[in-house]
Amino acid sequence: MGLIWLLLLSLLEPSWPTTGPGTRLRRDAGGRGGVYEHLGGAPRRRKLYCATKYHLQLHPSGRVNGSLENSAYSILEITAVEVGVVAIKGLFSGRYLAMNKRGRLYASDHYNAECEFVERIHELGYNTYASRLYRTGSSGPGAQRQPGAQRPWYVSVNGKGRPRRGFKTRRTQKSSLFLPRVLGHKDHEMVRLLQSSQPRAPGEGSQPRQRRQKKQSPGDHGKMETLSTRATPSTQLHTGGLAVA
């Protein structure tokens, strides 16, 4: 009888943990690809490197494009708005990545609903960023946007560094795949210079140095006047034309 009970327990054992991991997978992955459920708090400073070899950058003028070089406008702050939904802000431009109702990417000077993107993990290890507000049906690019539409509009940069319109994008295209890169040494230097230049008040720190240089200049007429007023004739020692108290 003891052997029979052991066999029954061994058959029931594998079924116990299946409910836990199964629910975990369904909670972490919504539809295709995974969702960053753990994000929140402080923003992540990253560079979004597209599979087309361009870094996504946001300009102060509101333009969005890709850059092959090390640009300060490609340093971004990715902040979690909700579970799987992020807002992308340019650190140096101060603008938010946004997509309008025509599927065009632009850099907005203020945060709005067009600045929210659904961040998902692609099977190849890249990330995709789809507009949370706009999407289209499966009937074609010219279809009207519907609340129950299925195909999202993705952030995309083509092989020439130009953004593609949302209704022309697919999640499997190289132009829609981005790899969040950690900032390098040069990027950290630019961020440090930006942070150190912001809190400084205008006109402070540089004037005292200039005043010291003016006082230390030899042969200055103003210096001779100050020395003559401070020193008395009885305590002056003349060496080489300079008065020392």
From Swiss-Prot:
Stretch forming the signal peptide: 1-17
Keywords on record: Developmental protein, Differentiation, Endoplasmic reticulum, Glycoprotein, Golgi apparatus, Growth factor, Mitogen, Nucleus, Proto-oncogene, Signal
Pfam family, one: FGF
Superkingdom of origin organism: Eukaryota
Biased amino acid composition, Polar residues: 226-238
Induction: By integration of mouse mammary tumor virus.
Biological processes annotated in GO: cell differentiation; fibroblast growth factor receptor signaling pathway; organ induction; otic vesicle formation; positive regulation of cell division; positive regulation of cell population proliferation; post-anal tail morphogenesis; semicircular canal morphogenesis
Region feature (Disordered): 137-181, 195-245
Residues linked to a glycan: N65
Cystine pairings recorded for this chain: none
The protein, known as: Fibroblast growth factor 3
Originating species: Mus musculus (Mouse)
